[in-house]
Amino acid sequence: MLSVDGAVLLLWPKDLPAHGALFWLLIAGLPNAVFVALVALNRADYESRHLRVLYYNDHRERRRMELVEEGQQSLKVFGYAYRLPLECGTFAQTVAKGMSLLKAQPLRDGTTIVRHLLLPEDDESDVVDPRLRQVLAQSSLTREGKLYAQLLAPLLDIIDGLAVSGVLPAVRLMVDDDVPPGQALQQIRVVLGAFHLPALECRVIPGCDGLMPVDAWLDAKETRPLLLMAAALHDVPPAESTEGGVAILLAPETLRLPSELVSCATIHRPVSRPADEFGEGVALSLLWGKAAPSSVERAWVTGFAEDQHALIGVACRRTGLERLTTHESRFNQDRVVGHAGNAAGWLAVTAAAEYGGERPQLILNRARTMQAAIVRAHPPRKS
């Protein structure tokens, strides 16, 4: 204010007397006007910055909620089938018992002895389904083709129900890098034709993707059902491995299906992380699965080497999954039947659906990366 008064005095004309209304208006009023203007400008700047931050935070929060809502999308499991060299009982019951079925036995050529499990080659005579028996009799089918047929047969009624409602599933075959994709596609098309199914879109995806085809299917916003099939057959089986296969039929939650088609489980969006970020991946899978850490009592584990199980314990402690820090709460199917290659992760999903229970279950799969997903089994429909 003194600087404004000084400027008025310096600029006041010398030939005018320094008094009067104009003089005192400038001396007393101009500094106050300048002060009010500066305060108003400062306040306007503060308000604009405050509103900018407020709207930015509001937009960021809305965007975060949109991303969380998108991340929490899931696929329903409408059916599954698996083929494994089990002695008796279901796969989930066998793994839950914890008794290893692995045994040292010679390879098919008799060259050496390896601890592993093999699918029987002469089990076609035990087939009850006449349609499946007719398909298996076709000479153009390889071992992979016959396994695809055995996996597909239990799902035929569901696929027929989808076809009647005008919804056809897309078929995705999970194959290893050393398997020619053209051969796998040719075999599944022969099987589909032999079962007289409509022409289904069939593609091959890398077996090392593990559970992540669910993530890709959700990102693509597909409205079709998804039929995933994986087979693990060996000419020279690795130690601690098993032959087998799995097929699982998934569909988006938004897909309207006939009332007679009832889902048996839900798989939430899986998360893939490297080993040093595994804890973050487990935490994110809980968020995507809308599961509180205290509600998860069981985990199905596959693909982890013996020295990597410590990572599971560390990740569980960091995310509040105290119940899963003990081996008793983690079902390790590899120790019971051996590792099933690219089918292992999906066998864990079917085991969780088959085991049932009201609480969410955690799937931990070691493929190309470490993967985690939440599976919720649905209670059977009352008749």
Task: Please annotate each region the language model reported.
Residues 241:
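Carbohydrate-active enzyme catalytic cores, enriched for enzymes
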Residues 229-234:
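Generic short beta-strand segments
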Residues 1-213, 217-220, 236-237, 246-383:
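Conserved "HGTGT" condensation-loop signature of ketosynthase/thiolase-family condensing enzymes
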